[in-house]
Each structure stands twice: as C-alpha cells, then as structure tokens.
C-alpha cells in the first residue's frame, strides 16, 4: 500500500513539473493571445457603453463626440487621440457642411474648433465650462447651433458659433436653458419659460397647468403651422404628458395623456410624418392612431415591427436624435452607444 501511494505522488510530481515547464515556455504566447483577445473585445465595443452627445457626417466619415472624439470610416470605428489638448470632448455638430467641435481644454477653458480637411482649427476659447450645443434640428439635419456654457458663478450662458454672447438679458442666475426649436429660435427653460432669442423676451406657461417643459418643435403635423411644447425634464415626476400650442398662447393643453409612468420627455424631432419624442426611456411617437386621433405611443410608424422592443432602447435614456437625411437618423443614448435608424431598420453602430 505504501509503495502504491509513493508511486502516485511521484507521478503527480512529474505531471506538475511538466505543466509548470509548459506554462513557463508558452506563457508569453498565452498572455499575448489573451491581450489580443482583450484588445479585439475592446475595439468591438468601443462605443458599446458610451454616451454620445453629438455627431457629424462628413462625406462617408462619421465623427462622434462621446467624451472623446471617435470616427467611423469604411466600417471601422477608431478613437482620435486629442488627449494632449483636451480634458474631454463635449459635443460635435455639422451645419451646412461645416463641422464644429466643442471641448474643454486642460486649462479649464471652453474651446470651439472647426474641421478643415483633417485638421482642427481653433475658432475661439473662453474661460467657461463647456456644456453642449443647443441644436436647431430640421428634418434632414442640424440647421443652426448655439453653445451652452456655464460661468464661474454657475450661471448658464449662450454663445453663437462666432463667440458672441447671445444670453437673453432678462435671464437670471437661476435660469436654465433646455431645448431650441427647429425654427424661430425659441428655447425652453426652467420655470416654464419659452425664450424668444430674436427679441430677448419670454412667455410663461401657467405653473398650475404643468410642472416643467422641455421639448419644443414647430410643425404642421395637425394640419396648420404651430409651435408645440411638451411637459418633461430631467427631474419631472408628473405621470401625465401634456402638449401645449402657441395657437392658444400655451394657455391650456391641446393634448393630455394620463399615466405615462416614468416616461419623461427631453426633446422632439419630426421624422416620417411623426414627432419622435426622446426621453429617459427611449423614444415615443406622437402621431395619429387608427381612429385619426393624436396619441403618444411606442414606435411603430418609424421603426420595423419588433425592432424597437428588441433593441432595449425603451429602457435607455437618450441624449439626442439627429437626422442626416429624410430617411436616416442617429439615436444618441445614455450609456448604450450610438444607433442608426434607416428606412425603418434599426442597427447599432
């Protein structure tokens, strides 16, 4: 019995030595392969859990701002290393073929740059915290943009792309600016305000009618041209969704949908004869139902059946929806990367 155990332990010792020698000889290749595997996995998911704030389509090249700057070219996504110059990239926008970048540099200054060929040219910088571009978005792209920034007193400021201050003179240190309309330069703000940038005035919605408003859009979806604003906001706890129109000077809602749960709207974009409303839980369509009555519903007109629910976007907050043509939009999420909706087909970039 003793001899049997001794032989067993000798065999185990020899086996362990062989395993050790094998690992020692091949450890470099093993760890190299593991490193390559991790690299491939990282590159495959380079935008998978990002939170894009802006995009710019230049020819066949797509630029994406998601804390860093990325570019998609020939089906491949890569990070553009600007870390020597910038703390982070806030936003990017394309207006009439020109691409503008909003960034925070390492000296805690806001910088706006313009893309010339493959190089970025500084337009201006200011001693402010960069926040985002306020984008006036049409059916096939961004029509106009302003810079939203924060000064040392935590007051929000608005600048045009030339660096001129466009902050409404009546705005106080408590005013916050949310969304800009697709026409007429109307901006929603806190305290139920709708600012008119062109004449520096604002309109109030009765505080008894709504808790907060955020999305704003000029549309003819109901037959005649009007400006619609909608309840929502980042801290909105109202379970009712209300839509107001300038046709009655925003006095009473033209539409109310009860019990929308945790749905809180952020912005509105018109696409495929529906208004897409981005929110903390994906996006919904504001359009006519089969009975010809306007309703807030899950995407069906703009997306192929089943594609939206399968994407899990309904559980994801959105940063923006940006059209690049009449049939293609990009969906910028909070933590779930970048998505494209083209001819009703939904894909992840």
Curated annotation (Swiss-Prot):
Domain of life: Bacteria
Keyword Signal set for record: yes
Signal peptide interval: 1-29
Keyword list, A-Z: Signal
Keyword Signal listed: yes
Protein's recorded name: Uncharacterized protein BB_0028
């Amino acid at each position: 019995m003793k001899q049997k155990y001794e032989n067993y332990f000798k065999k185990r010792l020899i086996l362990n030595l062989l395993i050790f020698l094998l690992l020692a000889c091949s450890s470099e290749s093993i760890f190299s392969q593991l490193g390559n595997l991790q690299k491939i996995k990282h590159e495959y998911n380079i935008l998978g859990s990002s939170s894009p704030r802006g995009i710019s389509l230049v020819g066949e090249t797509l630029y994406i701002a998601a804390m860093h700057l990325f570019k998609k070219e020939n089906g491949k996504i890569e990070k553009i290393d600007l870390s020597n110059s910038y703390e982070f990239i806030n936003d990017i926008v394309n207006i009439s073929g020109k691409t503008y970048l909003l960034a925070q540099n390492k000296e805690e200054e806001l910088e706006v740059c313009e893309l010339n060929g493959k190089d970025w040219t500084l337009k201006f910088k200011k001693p402010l915290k960069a926040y985002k571009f306020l984008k006036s978005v049409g059916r096939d792209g961004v029509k106009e943009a302003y810079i939203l920034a924060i000064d040392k007193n935590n007051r929000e400021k608005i600048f045009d792309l030339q660096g001129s201050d466009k902050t409404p003179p009546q705005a106080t240190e408590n005013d916050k600016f949310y969304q800009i309309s697709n026409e007429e330069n109307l901006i929603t703000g806190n305290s139920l305000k709708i600012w008119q940038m062109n004449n520096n005035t604002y309109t109030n919605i009765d505080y008894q009618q709504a808790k907060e408003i955020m999305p704003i859009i000029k549309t003819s979806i109901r037959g005649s041209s009007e400006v619609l604003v909608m309840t929502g906001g980042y801290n909105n706890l109202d379970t009712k969704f209300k839509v107001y129109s300038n046709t009655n000077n925003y006095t009473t809602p033209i539409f109310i949908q009860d019990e929308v749960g945790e749905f809180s709207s952020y912005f509105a974009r018109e696409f495929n004869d529906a208004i897409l409303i981005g929110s903390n839980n994906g996006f919904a369509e504001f359009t006519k139902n089969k009975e010809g009555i306007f309703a807030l519903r899950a995407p069906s007109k703009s997306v192929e059946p089943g594609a939206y629910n399968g994407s899990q976007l309904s559980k994801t907050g959105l940063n923006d929806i940006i059209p690049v043509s009449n049939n293609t939009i990009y969906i910028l999420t909070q933590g779930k990367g970048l998505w494209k909706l083209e001819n009703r087909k939904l894909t992840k970039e």
